């Protein structure tokens, strides 16, 4: 019975719980606090604190009721809490659960449930603060691409909604300060998945990309890539926070594993940028490191390669114990009507996977129908999950019945009465039907007007009574044509003005017109009282005057003025006696005659001008005896013919004799016009001609004709420049030379033909850098030697390296014929061996041999068991013999290559390699010797990821060697001994490292071992630089992490090596000498951050002089001196540093040479 009662209460509580809205009613503030070290306050950079106002009224809200705040474009809540309480005065009235949208939804929600503390008598209100971060994109998912357009830099309006209640606030978002043209990266923590979404956008290429490779991978093994959640695309643009706003497919190849994701792409069009994003799981999502591949070729540009490494740090969004679990997000379709996010039950002691379910409703299709009825009905055609359900909505509509009636209003009104219980509604239409109206207007004593309507029953007459105050009166007196006086009153409408018009008979009028000085006319009426006489005064401006002069028959002059009425024009008529007349006749260019009278002013003389067309003219030219010419015109009357008589003096005469084709002589006179020259032409038969051609010194040709008198012989003289000459040399079979000149006609080219006996020929074959062969013949002048040069591509070379029993190395090149393969045979002496003993944690001893390349040193590593108290041991020295040669001249080239590698906060390594090539010039007859010496400087940083040094300690081995190579002719064997020893130990007292010591000796055929100190000087010194190799090997640090101070250990070794070669030189000259100094140093630094830095560098300088004098007798002695000052560093296990002088180690080394 109790169980049934409990179930009943549960059912009742569920049945009565409802969804309410409008609880959140104000957006009070939205402020930003920097949750990390962000450089700008963008919408996606935590934390934005939203303060919202809320109100719960117990009369409308009940315990168990729910309400939801929908927050568009909110990505997550930046808190480890899962809920927040709405409290007032310490009392909780509702609990709200955080549901972050993250990568699943474009919005976040706050789902709240009313608590039992809310009763009908309580109305609670207050504020709540929500820490959150907005979503403005960050991946290529559909959710992020949609939210990438939520905001822009500057002022934005953020709007949340609680049901139909919207609350808003304006906020200013700052633009990203990262240059969008470079590569772009972003990482964002997804708290519900305990994962990070990581984005990488390629650098901008304005014209598109030809090809490229991009991606990222874990650096220290603390990151795993989720290959099932990857987006790859190209975006048309970026928003103000450098996130893609679109994603389009393109051609690429993807390689993904748990260690990294990489894509290789080609042909990205202009305006697009490729990007890739993925989910990653990190040991600590708030601190991890990624290495990025960044290679690309812009269209029309060069290949770019710029890899980089980034260490990401952040803040924790969840409790400390929540890290390390696997969280899976799944989507499930349910029969609910809204989308929700829920977390399935999870027991960390039993379950291994926490599941977040995204519950989505079954999609529906709505069909709307209608019918005649009262209620709306809904019917659902269900469908299984995975299909689409159908909702049929049947909406009712009513029919109507219209009732029309009349009323006394002035408009037609329509009223619809909806029947709530039936499908027939009533429409009442009222049509106006007014009574006739009678309006009566009357005046009364009040100063205001009133209107009173007396309404009669329908069908009768209504009365409108208007009472008006009396009108104002204006009296006007005017004249009219009658002879008596009348008075008329015009009553205006009420509120207007009445008029009283008095009409009087007109007064008699007297008009006076006068002229005045103004240019206009005025009329002034002087009105007399009624019955008197009015006066009209007209004032006129003076009239215009037109003066006309005319002739009359009298011999005297008269003037008459005709006055016009005012405003007209007065006329002045002047009559003059006629003027005397003069007639002039002239010719003009027209073909007709005209007569024109030019009237002069009265009293002068008029002119009659007759224009005649010109007469025809006849010109006659005749010669006379005078030496000048004259022209005389005899003018005829108009219409006849004029005569022009020209008299010319006689013309000059020019006589010309010319030849023609006839065999007889003629004379012709050509008369020129007067003043010209008459010509007398004598034509003679042609003379016979003789032509002569000769050469002269000028560069052009001329032709001169020497004409003889008629009947004789003419001469034509042609002068030609000398011809050009072409000399051709050819070989023939005779043993002697000949020269023949072939002369061409003038203006052409003479030929000089030289015949030479054939030259001797020398053929030379040489190699060049091209891949094909050519043959070139260099022809020498006659009598010389022709050269045939055959250029062959270099032969392929096969190098074979083998060991032999000698202590020196040789290189022999066997040159094959062109087109075949040369063989380089390198014979190397066996490598020297260095034995190193190390201690390890195993209970047995083993040995490993590390074989170096020829010329290097093989290493035998003996791994021995470790005991708590172990005596330091020294490895027996190993001797390496080197045979060296001394050359006359050294040419030295140096090349340095530096490579830097950085890995986040774990430090950087720099490796610098310098290579020197020593060669002998080709112009001396000594064998070519090439010696390469490398200098390597390595700086490294070691770090313990856990922050605790290992107890096994650190072993630092420093090896420093100095080599001097020389060549002598004839060769004298020289031995260079290299001694390497290593000291090992545990964390107790004792040395941990020692330098290598080089002892050099000079041996001739009769000596065994000689060590001495000597110095030699030379006058001609050429300073060169030779580098000496050095190496540093370091294992784990041994300093305890409890030390707060930094410990610095410095090891310095200085050595001076003097190599002197003396020559017993009877012919004189300087003996070659060499001086070498070496200064290696090692610095070790340890600090409380568990970082040890070791740096080894070695510099050596060498000076050398050479003799050019031929050596006839040689006796050689090699001396070496080594001075070593070295401080050994010992860690005693407690963090103290003990330094020991290394003279004892050096002594042990020397003693070991004789063991």
UniProtKB/Swiss-Prot annotation:
Disulphide bridges, residue numbers: 73-150, 96-112, 205-298, 227-256
Record's comment on post-translational modification: The GPI-anchor is attached to the protein in the endoplasmic reticulum and serves to target the protein to the cell surface. There, the glucosamine-inositol phospholipid moiety is cleaved off and the GPI-modified mannoprotein is covalently attached via its lipidless GPI glycan remnant to the 1,6-beta-glucan of the outer cell wall layer.
UniProt-annotated location(s): Cell membrane; Secreted, Cell wall
Membrane topology: Lipid-anchor; GPI-anchor
Alphabetized SUPFAM superfamilies for the sequence: Bacterial adhesins (SSF49401)
Disruption phenotype: Reduces adhesion and damage to both human umbilical vein endothelial cells (HUVEC) and oral epithelial cells.
Residues modified by glycosylation: 471, 543, 615, 651, 723, 759, 795, 881, 1023, 1099
Lipidation residue positions, type GPI-anchor amidated serine: 1134
Entry GO terms, CC: cell surface; extracellular region; extracellular vesicle; fungal-type cell wall; hyphal cell wall; plasma membrane; side of membrane; yeast-form cell wall
Main location: membrane
GO MF term list: cell adhesion molecule binding; high molecular weight kininogen binding
Outcome of mutating residue 634 to V: In allele ALS3-2
Positions of the propeptide segment: 1135-1155
Outcome following mutation: residue 963 to V: In allele ALS3-1
UniProtKB keywords: Cell adhesion, Cell membrane, Cell wall, Disulfide bond, Glycoprotein, GPI-anchor, Lipoprotein, Membrane, Repeat, Secreted, Signal, Virulence
Entry text on domains: Each ALS protein has a similar three-domain structure, including a N-ter domain of 433-436 amino acids that is 55-90 percent identical across the family and which mediates adherence to various materials; a central domain of variable numbers of tandemly repeated copies of a 36 amino acid motif; and a C-ter; domain that is relatively variable in length and sequence across the family.
Functional summary from the UniProt entry: Cell surface adhesion protein which mediates both yeast-to-host tissue adherence and yeast aggregation. Plays an important role in the biofilm formation and pathogenesis of C.albicans infections. Necessary for C.albicans to bind to N-cadherin on endothelial cells and E-cadherin on oral epithelial cells and subsequent endocytosis by these cells. During disseminated infection, mediates initial trafficking to the brain and renal cortex and contributes to fungal persistence in the kidneys.
Family named by the database record: Belongs to the ALS family.
Annotated protein name in UniProt: Agglutinin-like protein 3
Organism lineage: Eukaryota, Fungi, Dikarya, Ascomycota, Saccharomycotina
Gene expressing this chain: ALS3
